[in-house]
Amino acid sequence: MIKILFKAIFISVIFASCTGKDSEKGMEITISGKIFNKENAVVSLQAWADTLNTTIPVELNASTGDFSKKLTIQEPGFYRLFLSEGIFADLILFKNDIRVDVDENNRITVSGSPEMDLISRIDSLRDSFDLSPGMVALNEDFSKAVDSNDEVAIEQVRERYQGLLKDFNNQIAAQITEASPSIGVIQILSGNTLDRDEYFSVYEQVAEKFSGEWLDYSLVREFTEKVKMLKITAIGSVAPEINLPDPTGKFVKLSDFRGKYVLVDFWAKWCGPCRRENPNLVKAYNKFKGENFEVIGVSLDRNKEDWMQAIAEDGLSWVHVSDLKYFNSVAARDYNINAIPFSLLIDPNGIIVAKSLRGEALHRTLEKYLKPGA
């Protein structure tokens, strides 16, 4: 499938909403271009947020391959322009006219919009990173390490990769910070191009730059509100209080454990990934439990019997609390939980220091802050 190099950016459009703004005039935009291989080409446009999959036909000159479509939009939005079978371009429409050309090799070029120019720059950076001498050498060394089953060498290659990736992500962060405010930046960040925990300060900086007329657009409002929600559990934030009943009905507060490191683990009996991770969590708890460390399991079950059964079956000997309200749990709402398993490590002062700890990452993080059995 041939498409503009949006890579993973359009895979996870968590902020995409194209609901109309109260405006009689709207924004008039013309999408035009030329398809070199015009035989059997059929051009149409579709909004990403259109759950009805309504397509807007675009007139194509069959003899020249030229096409053009003028439309009026009330909001900036994300669209897919279908050009021919298996060929499409993902577009951000906002104020500026856009030109889309397809050459004889079916390569797509998009121009005319600062939002699309930003996407192109990010894609170029990504291509340069993938083909850089450092990455080429890294891939060669990784293949050798795997072929020889050298676990030490494999780990060394992974560490080198993290260093290269950090440098690359810093370049991306600089680009989008400089380009803000921009609808293109919202699209890039919505695709998880930058880790939300490690680069949350970038999300905040971008959100702060959207003000005034920018806030007339629902996409921008949703983005800024999402950043506010993310801040609740951002690393460095004070963990919200938890005050829920344990299996005996006694209420337990997170603040009761101040002075200790506390791993808060959101889970449930019905959650397969949670249950598969529990043996790893048991191993970590048995290794590090002591005066300075505790685990609080927050169950999103609905039935107490199910909750108790899972605790017993998995041998979970730490503190357990639940109001048995599924994702409507007050703790789930306060922590903005929309998927489990989810965990946070909270320091003795109540500050979130790590998140989403699973597998070996859990053990490495606990070793960073604790001594076994301390």
Region spans (language model):
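Sec-dependent signal peptide recognition
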Residues: I2-I11
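C-terminal motif of bacterial Sec signal peptides marking the signal peptidase cleavage site
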Residues: A16-S17
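A non-transmembrane, solvent-exposed segment enriched in polar/low-complexity residues
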Residues: G20-N170
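Conserved helix-turn-beta segment immediately C-terminal to the redox Cys motif
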Residues: W214, R276-V298, K368-K371
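N-terminal "domain-start" segment that seeds a small globular fold
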Residues: R221-L254, W318, R364-E367, K371-P372
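Conserved redox-active cysteine motifs that mediate thiol-disulfide chemistry
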Residues: R258, F266-K283
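Short, internal strand/loop/helix patches
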Residues: M308-F342, I346-N349
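Non-catalytic, surface beta->alpha helical segment in thiol-disulfide oxidoreductase systems
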Residues: A339, I351-A374
